[in-house]
């Protein structure tokens, strides 16, 4: 992901290292070398993705590229696992944000769009649908803030908080990312057929929402 980034973190096995995950080390791969020359790797292709199109994902080929080891040798997999855990947290936060955007759009439309001689937001079934989106968005935001608090306490040396973070992070990622897919679809319906048009944000939010439960 983010194939055109200035730096990338990659796992590689140094010569003579052990087999399996224990022999992997973490390396920093810059796009350009200190003298300004491009590093020796090529982006072979960019992937035609359903969503998150603003962040290009691609395949690269290393051609004698220069990279710098990060941390202790042969602990790359452990370091990458820590990064993946943080990425799971960010996925949950991202899902919470997507639902908040979907809810904001849905409420705006429900207040301004009329049906049966009155605004949509006055109709009981529409209120029920909006409430479902709101509950999912609020629960995701609440657990996101709680997990962030526990993470700050864990970084300060609280061992009990560290254990809670290990539990909360996958729960947030699983629940929020699943809820975001449903919430994005329900919010699109509030705008009607216009929500299916790329001129509005609903289509992009819906596409992006489906990635969270797949990543990490």
What kind of region is each of these model predictions?
Residues 32-40, 44, 49, 56-87, ...:
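A glycine-rich, basic-preceded beta-loop-alpha segment at the flavin cofactor/substrate interface
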């Amino acid at each position: 992901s983010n194939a055109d980034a200035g730096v990338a973190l990659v796992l590689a096995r140094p010569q003579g290292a052990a087999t399996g995950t224990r022999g992997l080390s973490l390396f920093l791969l810059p796009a350009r070398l200190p003298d300004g020359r491009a590093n020796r790797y090529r982006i072979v292709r960019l992937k035609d993705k359903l969503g998150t199109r603003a962040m290009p994902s691609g395949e690269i080929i290393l051609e004698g590229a220069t990279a710098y080891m990060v941390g202790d040798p042969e602990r790359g997999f452990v370091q990458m696992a820590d990064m993946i855990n943080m990425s799971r947290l960010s996925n949950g936060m991202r899902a919470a944000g997507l639902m908040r955007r979907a809810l904001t759009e849905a409420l705006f439309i429900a207040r301004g769009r009329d049906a049966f001689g009155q605004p949509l937001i006055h109709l009981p079934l529409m209120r029920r649908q909006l409430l479902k989106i709101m509950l999912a968005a609020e629960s995701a935001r609440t657990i996101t803030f709680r997990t962030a608090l526990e993470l700050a306490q864990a970084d300060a040396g609280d061992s009990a908080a560290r254990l809670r973070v290990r539990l909360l992070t996958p729960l947030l990622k699983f629940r929020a990312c699943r809820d975001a897919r449903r919430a994005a679809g329900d919010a699109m319906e509030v705008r009607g057929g216009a929500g299916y048009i790329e001129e509005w944000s609903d289509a992009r939010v819906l596409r992006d929402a489906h990635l969270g439960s797949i990543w990490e």
